[in-house]
Amino acid sequence: MPNQHMLLLFNLLPVGSNISTWWNFGSMLLTCLALQTMTGFFLAIHYTANINLSFSSIVHITRDVPYGWMMQNLHAIGASMFFICIYIHIARGLYYGSFLNKNVWLSGTTLLIILMATAFFGYVLPWGQMSFWAATVITNLLTAVPYIGTELTNWLWGGFSINDPTLTRFFALHFILPFTIISMSSIHIMLLHTEGSSNPLGTNSDIDKIPFHPYHSHKDMLMLTIMMTALFIIMSFNPNIFNDPENFSKANPLVTPQHIKPEWYFLFAYGILRSIPNKLGGAVALVLSVTILMTMPFTHTSHMRSMAFRPLMQFMFWTLVTTFIMITWAATKPVEPPFTTIGQVTSILYFTFFIMNPLLGWLENKISITNM
């Protein structure tokens, strides 16, 4: 076909006419993934996975490598952008009932777990103070596993403490896992397109579909432009906004930072971990804080898919959003009153959403039947 349109593939993709801007975050995540893979590749060329040289190699990248500062800052800020987009993407899925497409939701949650692991390994690589101590604290949680905990930890560390073998394997994992994410993303998208997207009303879109291009493709491009503009503005004017000041000092196993904390995007899980005084209990709660998302398709009892017409669940949803922000904030503070109490209360409220979901669905069904 001589004049075949370049976007014919997208022309042939029918999409519901009423999907809102909240549906744009999937394409934004794909862009973030491409950006992270490219900048990561250029950083890996100059990076040295050695405890004596890694910190210096980051300094070398930012000072001596042409545009190295740009690659390093784009990669660091891009990770934060990635998590902002993914949390909004998940929130949209919860609000509009996208989780009822089970395969898509479960593959997405698996993707989130792999992404969090990748980001954690990446945070350790600069071998700054916070990198080292965050790695020590988080990997040490494996010792809470009954019977095999200590052996598991030593196996991960490659010795009896965090050392050169740990950094080497973390770099190897940080390099290889993005390719797993790319593969999983392809599966995620294929599973989505077997059934198609949901929409804000939670109804079947088959009766009213429009071509993806030019309508939704232009909408996607607008949001991508906004995201990239925000990324470059942050990179140009305040590149260290998401960084911890402690991480500008080289790792020293003999000096413990006053307050150990991971990157901001893990603080909600870290806050939940910290709110339980028992080590094993905290580790279980940490894992549950993410894996509990997998229960959503199986605990949905309401006759309505979307929360658009469910005021009680809307209240619970916005409580969850506020709780998420509160846990993140409390986890940045020292382990002392009132922050410990705030952390414990918000952790309970976080899990309350998932417990109340089936109960409120059942109650709303009762109310709607009574009013008929």
From Swiss-Prot:
Q: List all membrane-crossing ranges.
A: 25-45, 69-90, 105-125, 170-190, 218-238, 280-300, 312-332, 339-358
Q: Which domain of life is it from?
A: Eukaryota
- Family matches, as SUPFAM superfamilies: a domain/subunit of cytochrome bc1 complex (Ubiquinol-cytochrome c reductase) (SSF81648), Transmembrane di-heme cytochromes (SSF81342)
User: What keywords is this UniProt entry annotated with?
Assistant: Electron transport, Heme, Iron, Membrane, Metal-binding, Mitochondrion, Mitochondrion inner membrane, Respiratory chain, Transmembrane, Transmembrane helix, Transport, Ubiquinone
Q: Which cofactor does it need?
A: heme b
The record ties this protein, via Pfam families, to: Cytochrom_B_C (PF00032), Cytochrome_B (PF00033)
Residues that coordinate or bind heme b b566: 89, 188
Q: Where on this chain does a ubiquinone bind?
A: 193
- Record keyword Transport present: yes
User: What CDD domains does the record point to?
Assistant: cytochrome_b_C, Cytochrome_b_N
Q: Where in the cell is it found?
A: Mitochondrion inner membrane
Q: What does the record say about its membrane topology?
A: Multi-pass membrane protein
Cofactor: binding details: Binds 2 heme b groups non-covalently.
| Other facts | Heme 1 (or BL or b562) is low-potential and absorbs at about 562 nm, and heme 2 (or BH or b566) is high-potential and absorbs at about 566 nm.
Family, as annotated? Belongs to the cytochrome b family.
Kindly state the subunit structure of this protein.
The cytochrome bc1 complex contains 3 respiratory subunits (MT-CYB, CYC1 and UQCRFS1), 2 core proteins (UQCRC1 and UQCRC2) and probably 6 low-molecular weight proteins.
PANTHER family, A to Z: CYTOCHROME B
Give the function comment from the record: Component of the ubiquinol-cytochrome c reductase complex (complex III or cytochrome b-c1 complex) that is part of the mitochondrial respiratory chain. The b-c1 complex mediates electron transfer from ubiquinol to cytochrome c. Contributes to the generation of a proton gradient across the mitochondrial membrane that is then used for ATP synthesis.
Q: Could you tell me what this protein is called?
A: Cytochrome b
Q: Report the source organism.
A: Pantherophis bairdi
